[in-house]
Amino acid sequence: MVITLYSKAGCHLCDEARTLLENVAADADFELDEIDIRRDAALFERYRYRIPVIAIDGAEALEGRFDERDVLAAINRGEAT
């Protein structure tokens, strides 16, 4: 399973999401891929007001504010598909 975190520097919610995902990684088996939306104009346009955004195996799962329970539920849904 690959979890992609769409983020950008200076985004405190993105920093919180990264830390949360790093903590969850201790109990869940996934590869974390972080993408800075400022490096791609299309991604910036798509996500700039929504970050942080988490995608699981390419499917958007969470955005904005979320907690560990939300992440674990999204991971479980991703494993079920």
Residue ranges: model-predicted function:
Residues 8-10, 41, 51:
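A short, glycine- and basic residue-enriched loop/turn
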